[in-house]
Amino acid sequence: MAKEESIEVEGEILEALPNAQFRVKLENGLEVLAHVSGKIRMHYIRILPGDKVKVQISPYDLSKGRITYRYK
């Protein structure tokens, strides 16, 4: 079985939740629950409410995602 491609969308952090999770409002208006990717966690990149981020979303569950980039 081939792995489905993930969807990459930009969004804005609404609130920080426990366990390095965030509520993100995407540019299409949806809100998703997103966690921080390993590279961002490894390099201690701080993510705060109001930051613009890039989120990868699985096509299987459109309510959860992974934050892969924080825009400067």
From Swiss-Prot:
Residues 1-72 form the S1-like domain. One of its GO terms (molecular function) is translation initiation factor activity. Keywords: Cytoplasm, Initiation factor, Protein biosynthesis, RNA-binding, rRNA-binding. The keyword RNA-binding applies. Pfam families: eIF-1a. Component of the 30S ribosomal translation pre-initiation complex which assembles on the 30S ribosome in the order IF-2 and IF-3, IF-1 and N-formylmethionyl-tRNA(fMet); mRNA recruitment can occur at any time during PIC assembly. PANTHER family: TRANSLATION INITIATION FACTOR IF-1, CHLOROPLASTIC. NCBIfam families: infA (TIGR00008). This is Translation initiation factor IF-1.
